[in-house]
């Protein structure tokens, strides 16, 4: 037996919209009435009518509702199934109503979408019910009754199109698959989509792709039936045709020559239909990038004993002392091979002769003015001083203070810091 619940808020203006909602189902559907009232009370005056499944079809023929919520029982009898069919297909006066189906979890994926606009799977949550309100409010063509209007037909207002008309892919049976779904139609919706409908769109797209794949297999099997030699009494089902094709191809490969087989293979490879998309080759790093990575790895494990091993690959800064006769604007070039070999030993005992200094090396050596316990690339970069190469190479003795001309490998006791210009740490 149907019962009505009217939710009227105070301070409602005379033109406040009205929504007539029909709740259909067993006794448990009554618990939804309070939730539905709270959700729709902010946008309109809500009138809720509760009815069981058997009386709902007759009620829909006599009254007009803006929204129908049908809660499908977890176990359906033949009588209840027939009543649900009448509700879904016997909507004479409520063809433009919003139909929401609440489907039990054990019926998930079994009930088709014909006659429904939104399908909610149990267990119900506030988020799912809020999607119904959002779906209703975002549809620009929804129509509700007002106190000063007797009906949308009399006002000449366009009736709300059923969302199932927008979707356009619902079948005509409760537990049937959709013909339009197999055709892949109705993938675009004008109204905003809930999460359930987005998943349904993805499902439809997958179904259309699967249909296309099956059509291709069917077409190829028909072609194979034609290409295979005729054998009286041969089976024509797809599996038998494929097995016969495999035997036939094996027989042909044994008879043809390798040269002809190579031509066939080349022809198949040239056909892009049977080739996968080529992967983009990975680009190798530039030589400069590799060199920088090598230098960084060497410098990260720097030690004073290996300080001069990579001078030809590293720029070092130098500052002249007041006792020097000539400034460090004069450049020094060191051959990479000889400098690296001579620098392997102890820096304080290694002697570099003047003949070792030449203009043949392509690497500029810059000297650092003070000893650094652990190499700091940032500090060296911040103290970088450009050195311009002159046209002629001055003697090595001119680069040293007067009291240190005896040799590079000897320690100066008078000026202990002078040799620190020439040994990099």
From Swiss-Prot:
SUPFAM superfamilies: HLH, helix-loop-helix DNA-binding domain. GO terms for biological process: cell differentiation; oocyte differentiation; regulation of transcription by RNA polymerase II; spermatogenesis. Keywords: Cytoplasm, Developmental protein, Differentiation, DNA-binding, Nucleus, Oogenesis, Spermatogenesis, Transcription, Transcription regulation. Transcription regulator of both male and female germline differentiation. Suppresses genes involved in spermatogonial stem cells maintenance, and induces genes important for spermatogonial differentiation. Coordinates oocyte differentiation without affecting meiosis I. It is found in: Nucleus; Cytoplasm. GO terms for cellular component: chromatin; cytoplasm; nucleus. This is Spermatogenesis- and oogenesis-specific basic helix-loop-helix-containing protein 2. Its main location: nucleus. Residues 201-252 form the bHLH domain. The gene is SOHLH2. The keyword Ribonucleoprotein does not apply. The keyword Nucleus applies. Forms both hetero- and homodimers with SOHLH1. GO terms for molecular function: DNA-binding transcription factor activity, RNA polymerase II-specific; protein heterodimerization activity; protein homodimerization activity; RNA polymerase II cis-regulatory region sequence-specific DNA binding; sequence-specific double-stranded DNA binding. Pfam families: HLH.
């Amino acid at each position: 037996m149907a019962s009505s619940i009217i939710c009227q808020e105070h301070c409602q203006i005379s033109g406040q919209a009205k929504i007539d909602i029909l709740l259909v189902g067993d006794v448990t559907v009554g618990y939804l009435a309070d939730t539905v009232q709270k959700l729709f009370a902010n946008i309109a005056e809500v009138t809720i009518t509760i009815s069981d499944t058997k009386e709902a079809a007759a009620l829909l023929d006599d009254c007009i509702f803006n929204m129908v919520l049908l809660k499908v029982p977890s176990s359906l009898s033949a009588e209840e199934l027939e009543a649900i069919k009448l509700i879904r297909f016997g909507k004479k006066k409520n063809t433009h109503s919003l139909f929401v189906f609440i489907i039990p979890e054990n019926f998930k994926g079994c009930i088709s979408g014909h006659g429904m606009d939104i399908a909610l799977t149990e267990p119900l949550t506030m988020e799912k019910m809020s999607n119904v309100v959002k779906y209703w409010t975002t549809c620009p063509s929804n129509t509700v009754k007002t106190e000063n209007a007797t009906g949308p037909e009399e006002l000449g207002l366009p009736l709300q199109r059923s969302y199932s008309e927008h979707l356009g892919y619902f079948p005509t049976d409760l537990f049937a698959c959709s013909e339009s779904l197999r055709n892949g139609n109705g993938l675009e919706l004008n109204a905003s989509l809930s999460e359930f409908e987005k998943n349904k769109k993805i499902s439809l797209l997958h179904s259309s792709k699967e249909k296309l794949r099956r059509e291709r297999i069917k077409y190829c099997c028909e072609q194979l039936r034609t290409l295979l030699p005729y054998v009286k009494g041969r089976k024509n089902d797809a599996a038998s045709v494929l097995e016969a094709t495999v035997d036939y191809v094996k027989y042909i490969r044994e008879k043809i020559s390798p040269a002809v087989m190579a031509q066939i293979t080349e022809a198949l490879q040239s056909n892009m239909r049977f080739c996968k998309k080529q992967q983009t080759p990975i680009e190798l790093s530039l030589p400069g990038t590799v060199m920088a990575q090598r230098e960084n790895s060497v410098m990260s494990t720097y030690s004073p004993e290996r300080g001069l091993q990579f001078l030809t690959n590293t720029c070092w800064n130098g500052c002249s002392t007041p006792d020097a006769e000539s400034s460090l604007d004069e450049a020094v070039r060191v051959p990479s091979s000889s400098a690296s070999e001579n620098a392997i030993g102890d820096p304080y005992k290694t002697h570099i002769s003047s003949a070792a200094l030449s203009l043949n090396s392509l690497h500029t050596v810059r000297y650092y003015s003070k000893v650094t316990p652990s190499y700091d690339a940032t500090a060296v970069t911040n103290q970088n001083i450009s050195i311009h190469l002159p046209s002629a190479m001055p003697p090595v003795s001119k680069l040293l203070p007067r009291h240190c001309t005896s040799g590079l490998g000897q320690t100066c006791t008078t000026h202990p810091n002078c040799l620190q210009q020439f040994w990099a740490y």
